[in-house]
Swiss-Prot record:
<dbReference type="GO" id="GO:0003677">
    <property type="term" value="F:DNA binding"/>
</dbReference>
<feature type="compositionally biased region" description="Polar residues">
    <location>
        <begin position="202"/>
        <end position="218"/>
    </location>
</feature>
<keyword id="KW-0805">Transcription regulation</keyword>
<feature type="compositionally biased region" description="Polar residues">
    <location>
        <begin position="249"/>
        <end position="260"/>
    </location>
</feature>
<keyword id="KW-0804">Transcription</keyword>
<dbReference type="GO" id="GO:0003700">
    <property type="term" value="F:DNA-binding transcription factor activity"/>
</dbReference>
<comment type="function">
    <text>Transcription factor. Interacts specifically with the W box (5'-(T)TGAC[CT]-3'), a frequently occurring elicitor-responsive cis-acting element. Modulates phosphate homeostasis and Pi translocation by regulating PHO1 expression.</text>
</comment>
<feature type="region of interest" description="Disordered">
    <location>
        <begin position="1"/>
        <end position="20"/>
    </location>
</feature>
<dbReference type="InterPro" id="IPR036576">
    <property type="entry name" value="WRKY_dom_sf"/>
</dbReference>
<feature type="DNA-binding region" description="WRKY">
    <location>
        <begin position="286"/>
        <end position="352"/>
    </location>
</feature>
<dbReference type="GO" id="GO:0043565">
    <property type="term" value="F:sequence-specific DNA binding"/>
</dbReference>
<keyword id="KW-0539">Nucleus</keyword>
<dbReference type="Pfam" id="PF03106">
    <property type="entry name" value="WRKY"/>
</dbReference>
<dbReference type="InterPro" id="IPR003657">
    <property type="entry name" value="WRKY_dom"/>
</dbReference>
<feature type="region of interest" description="Disordered">
    <location>
        <begin position="180"/>
        <end position="260"/>
    </location>
</feature>
<feature type="region of interest" description="Disordered">
    <location>
        <begin position="506"/>
        <end position="528"/>
    </location>
</feature>
<protein>
    <recommendedName>
        <fullName>WRKY transcription factor 42</fullName>
    </recommendedName>
</protein>
Length: 528
């Protein structure tokens, strides 16, 4: 703010002294705007006189309420200085004002920027959290999708397996595989090709179909078989009257001689079908859940049996498609360390060398069991005290036993203890493997005693008991041999003694056996 002094006297202010200037300067006090008319007239006259006298100077009379005190005074000069405020941008005060405004703007801008930064930081944190949630949700979805695919695939596999098993069961019930009745269980491949007119179903069960089927079997060497499921197998063990149903159906056809003959044919077919289901049971001590017999198995069922708290597991051979061999595995109720394995059926594929021990053992035992089916139940091989069974398997009664109580003939090989009085390593017919606990049969003794031949199949690279080209002749020879043994006690005793001497290799018994054989031969010559 600048002060500009103004002089109303018209003279130069430089000539005035400071004392004169202070004396001449008059201060305007209060102005009486409500004075009387006389005072106004007097003041106006005085002013006119002053103007007339000094036209070049301006005199201002100081007014006061007390006019008398100021009459003798006259002031020539009045300080009417003006305090002007300029709007120059270059002034100090304007610069201060401008600085304050700029600082306020900067502070406001900084505050806004800080708020924006905070908002952006919060938005980025929310974005990161949403990304994590999205990633976790995606991972959960992928895992659930994989689990769903696995469950669906597992269900499809179970459905496929169930469908395959049902189809196999239906196929086995409808098809009639080619075989020779009452012969050895074949280890070689068998033919599954059957003409449509020779196929039949088990559920029909009508007498004409049974008659037609039995006649086709007798003429074309075919027999009726049916693959058993775990339920039907367990029912078969509990129901000993399963086979006589065929006899009941055959009784409807009675009336004349031809119908009686056909009923006999039906009965014979049922008996042969029953003998076809011969089982070989092996008892061995093992801590493993299953014996290592060299084959590959798949478990398809398990159930509890009466009288045994241990479950019975059912297995099927998976080394070839459609292999009918099955086995049942169950722990002994009296001794849990004994594992009972029951084999049924014959392999239709080549066997590896590791599987030949058990396959040969079970095949020979089943062959011995089936070879005696032409004899009666009283004198046949179904009797545990049969001479032929004791001769072929020269073991103790606990080592090899034959059961006739089950609906299907079963022979049991007990490997839990060695036979009494015989050295297993010196027995040429049955050798017990110390390493695997399996039974190895001497394949050069049993077939010749049973009137059969042993063939070696080089194409399939395994040896087994195969069907001869003339099965009926072999069956007739076996029938003739067994009939001769049953009809001639002396010859039976001589044959038993001879076989015993050959197996044991005893020189002392060999002389006695020769005498007995000579006596038997002379008796036979005399009868002839």
């Amino acid at each position: 703010m600048f002060r500009f002094p103004v002089s109303l006297g018209g003279g130069p202010r430089e000539n005035l002294k400071p004392s004169d200037e202070q004396h001449q300067r008059a201060v305007v006090n209060e102005v009486d705007f409500f004075r009387s008319a006389e005072k106004r007239d007097r003041v106006s006259r005085e002013e006119q006189n002053i103007i007339a006298d000094e036209t070049h100077r301006v005199h201002v009379k100081r007014e006061n309420s007390r006019v008398d005190d100021h009459d003798d005074r006259s002031t020539d000069h009045i300080n009417i200085g003006l305090n002007l405020l300029t709007a120059n941008t270059g002034s100090d005060e304007s610069m201060v004002d401008d600085g304050l405004s700029v600082d306020m703007e900067e502070k406001r801008t900084k505050c806004e920027n800080a708020q924006l930064r905070e908002e952006l930081k919060k938005a980025s944190e929310d974005n990161q959290r949403l990304k994590q949630m999205l990633s976790q949700t995606t991972n959960n979805f992928n895992s659930l999708q994989m689990q769903l695919v696995a469950v669906m695939r597992q269900q499809e596999d179970h459905h496929h397996l169930a469908t395959t098993e049902n189809n196999d069961n239906v196929k086995n019930r409808h098809e009639v595989p080619e075989m020779v009745p009452r012969q050895f269980i074949d280890l070689g491949p068998h033919s599954d090709e059957v003409s449509s007119e020779e196929r039949t179903t088990v559920r029909s069960g009508s007498p004409p179909s049974l008659l037609e089927k039995s006649s086709s079997r007798q003429n074309g060497k075919r027999v009726l078989v049916r693959e058993e499921s775990p339920e039907t197998e367990s029912n078969g063990w509990r129901n000993p009257n399963k086979v006589p149903k065929h006899h009941a159906s055959s009784s409807i056809c009675g009336g004349n001689g031809s119908e009686n003959a056909s009923s006999k044919v039906i009965e014979q077919a049922a008996a042969e079908a029953t003998m076809r289901k011969a089982r070989v049971s092996v008892r061995a001590r093992s801590e493993a859940p299953m014996l290592s017999d060299g084959c590959q198995w798949r478990k398809y069922g398990q159930k509890m049996a009466k009288g045994n708290p241990c479950p019975r597991a059912y297995y099927r051979c998976t080394m070839a498609v459609g292999c009918p061999v099955r086995k049942q595995v169950q722990r002994c109720a009296e001794d849990r360390t004994i594992l009972i394995t029951t084999y049924e059926g014959n392999h239709n594929h080549p066997l590896p060398p590791a599987a030949m021990n058990m396959a040969s053992t079970t095949t020979a035992a089943a062959s011995m069991l089936l070879s005696g089916s032409t004899m009666s139940n009283q004198d046949g091989l179904m009797n545990p005290t049969n001479l032929l069974a004791r001769t072929i398997l020269p073991c103790s009664s606990s080592m090899a036993t034959i059961s006739a109580s089950a609906p299907f003939p079963t022979i049991t090989l007990d490997l839990t203890e060695s036979p009494n009085g015989n050295n297993p390593t010196n027995n040429p017919l049955m050798q017990f493997s110390q390493r695997s606990g399996l039974v190895e049969l001497n394949q050069s003794v049993l077939p010749h005693m049973m009137g059969q031949a042993l063939y070696y199949n080089q194409q399939s690279k395994f040896s087994g008991l195969h069907m001869p080209s003339q099965p009926l002749n072999a069956g007739e020879s076996v029938s003739a041999a067994t009939a001769a043994i049953a009809s001639n006690p002396n010859f039976a005793a001589a044959l038993a003694a001879a076989i015993t001497s050959i197996i044991n290799g005893s020189n002392n018994q060999q002389n006695g056996n020769n005498n007995n054989s000579n006596v038997t031969t002379s008796n036979v010559d005399n009868r002839q």
